[in-house]
């Protein structure tokens, strides 16, 4: 195969790929949003958001406790070193 033939073949592949991409984008845009796959994806994202919110709510007391404990340790070290 010559270089020109390879370049022409590559151009044809690019044109076909671009056409398929445009066709699939058009089909996706034409979707009315009531398809089963879309509703499953929406349910999954809503479930994930709910779980993330629950985990964040459970994490705040732990973070607060660690921060207060760290502050208490620093203050204890500071005042105990001055007392000696």
Curated annotation (Swiss-Prot):
Transmembrane segments: 59-76
Listed Gene3D superfamilies: 1.20.5.80
Family: Belongs to the inovirus capsid protein family.
Periplasmic side: 30-58
Stated name of the protein: Capsid protein G8P
Membrane topology listed for this record: Single-pass type I membrane protein
Function in brief: Self assembles to form a helical capsid wrapping up the viral genomic DNA. The capsid displays a filamentous structure with a length of 760-1950 nm and a width of 6-8 nm. The virion assembly and budding take place at the host inner membrane.
Main location per the UniProt record: virion
Disulfide cysteine pairs (residue numbers): none
